[in-house]
Amino acid sequence: MSEQKLALNEYLKTDSDYLRGTIKEGLDSAVTGSFSDGDQQLIKFHGFYQQDDRDLRNERKEQKLEPLYSFMLRARVPGGICSPQQWLGVDKIASTLTSSNSIRLTTRQTFQYHGIPKRNLKTIIQDLDREALDSIAACGDVNRNVMCNPNPVESKLHEQAYAVAKQLSDHLLPHTRAYAEIWLDEEKLLSTEDETVEPVYGKTYLPRKFKMAVAVPPDNDVDVYTNDLGFIAVAENGELVGFNLTAGGGMGSTHGEVETFPRLADDFGFIKTADVMKFAEAVMTVQRDWGNRVNRKRSRLKYTIVDHGYEKFKAEVELRAGVKFEPKRDVVIGDRGDRYGWVEGVDRKWHLTLFIESGRIKDLPGQTLQTGLREIAKIHKGDFRMTSNQNMIIAGVAAEDKATIEGLARKHGLLGQVLTQTRGHSIACVALPTCPLAMAEAERYFPEFIDHIDALQAKHGISEQAIVVRMTGCPNGCARPFAAEIGLVGKAPGRYNLYLGASFEGTRLNKMHRENIQEAEILAELDTLFGRYAVERDAGETFGNFTVRVGVVKAVIDAAKDFHG
């Protein structure tokens, strides 16, 4: 019987000499702005994707020119924390080495650059390195940027949780020296060509991307259940004692293919802080060994758990960790939004959360966000914290410095805008024109769409109710649309699938209500539902729970069985 053929990416990884491929040769070639097909997969492990301007694609084709290739580079910033000095370096790169002249905060607490010509890639990575930043494993079949609730109010508990997130990120980094050799001109050592180069990953790394998050209850801004692996902090008397571990979440799916589906993670039990690395490595290596390497659409950990079964997976993780799970501790998971404006922490320091629409930091007439953050960074003595809602926290401000920081924020349009509850809880992915997977607009259209939502809520007298709204240009789910009370997922230009019924806290998925509809139909549908919600809701009932209770959509209990059913 012939051996089952693996996905193409598996052969590329095996033959890449631990992610080197021919990236260096492709970088040196001035004949094209592109990398080879194989290297386009490998460069993801180095933190960037090849893209082109889709707005110009047809025009350039008519001119017999290759697409206007550029690159999106994503940094690795565990927990989203960087210093003001680092931010100044990040800002300078955006202003001098990218065509977008902007910084994009992501839904995973880091930043990315768009519009990088190939010739500038090495310079950018070297400039980031000078700021003690990198893009290693920000993309690819590895552990991605580790999220951690930025919770600056409970400073001691956050500090402890952040230390775990940082340790997870560092411990599970690829060991290959390919990044240092190609981008930082480190001298190449003789390749050992054995598994000791990557003691955790091996030559073929993971079957697919792997995402981790550390949540600090009651906040669930990191959407912990949407991650492959989650750690929900458990505290006693303000001290971190361990975590409830979750595994098997993930948002991506494919339109029309019912064997693919989003899924929220399962609860596995409580683990002590000292055992976090053992369990993280155990979960990752089970996925490494059991994950599907034949069909990449079924390669995420969520499918591994579904296919092998919860109990079998749990037993194998305990075996590899050498420790058994304890019963999960009772914790309360609550709001997924950010605390906007000034908040005082237990350490008497102040923290200013700034709303950044769709995470895009750019200077526009009347709203010079990029300049404003630059000016704040020049005088700020604390740190900058990126949130998973694509916002920025100016953290650790002394009381005597508040007025100066606030003055700069207001001067540059970072503060003072009218912000509804729903807009403050809503996010969108980048989509067009740069993302090659996008089928419809997201970031460019989303502010206008939220204007319509705000108007409908005002019409029905429900503006005080925060509703989690998310939009993506495709079903890959970068803005976690399947965990939104109202999720819009691009199907074609100007057309979206409308999903309803997720819980406000992020503990239940939504379900498709209408397929492939345009703005007018979406708004008409929501107009009717908001009208019903205004008069039929129970006290304190959220919109997502309402749509399930009154039968607009059925609750998704087991995504493998009922997300599509």
Curated annotation (Swiss-Prot):
Gene Ontology MF terms: 4 iron, 4 sulfur cluster binding; heme binding; metal ion binding; NADP binding; sulfite reductase (ferredoxin) activity; sulfite reductase (NADPH) activity
Biological process according to GO: cysteine biosynthetic process; hydrogen sulfide biosynthetic process; sulfate assimilation
Keyword Cell membrane: no
SUPFAM superfamilies xrefs: Nitrite and sulphite reductase 4Fe-4S domain-like (SSF56014), Nitrite/Sulfite reductase N-terminal domain-like (SSF55124)
Chain positions recorded as siroheme binding sites: C478
Pathway assigned to this chain's UniProt record: Sulfur metabolism; hydrogen sulfide biosynthesis; hydrogen sulfide from sulfite (NADPH route): step 1/1
E.C. number: 1.8.1.2
Gene3D superfamilies, alphabetized: Sulfite Reductase Hemoprotein, domain 1
Enzyme class: oxidoreductase
Cellular component GO terms held in the UniProt record: sulfite reductase complex (NADPH)
Listed cofactors: siroheme; [4Fe-4S] cluster
Known catalytic reactions: hydrogen sulfide + 3 NADP(+) + 3 H2O = sulfite + 3 NADPH + 4 H(+)
Cofactor binding note of this UniProt entry: Binds 1 siroheme per subunit. Binds 1 [4Fe-4S] cluster per subunit.
Binding site for [4Fe-4S] cluster: C429, C435, C474, C478
Superkingdom, taxonomy of origin: Bacteria
Alphabetic keyword roster: 4Fe-4S, Amino-acid biosynthesis, Cysteine biosynthesis, Heme, Iron, Iron-sulfur, Metal-binding, NADP, Oxidoreductase
Assigned protein family: Belongs to the nitrite and sulfite reductase 4Fe-4S domain family.
Biological role: Component of the sulfite reductase complex that catalyzes the 6-electron reduction of sulfite to sulfide. This is one of several activities required for the biosynthesis of L-cysteine from sulfate.
Subunit structure as annotated in this protein's UniProt entry: Alpha(8)-beta(8). The alpha component is a flavoprotein, the beta component is a hemoprotein.
Descriptive protein name: Sulfite reductase [NADPH] hemoprotein beta-component
Lineage: Bacteria, Pseudomonadati, Pseudomonadota, Gammaproteobacteria, Alteromonadales
Gene: cysI
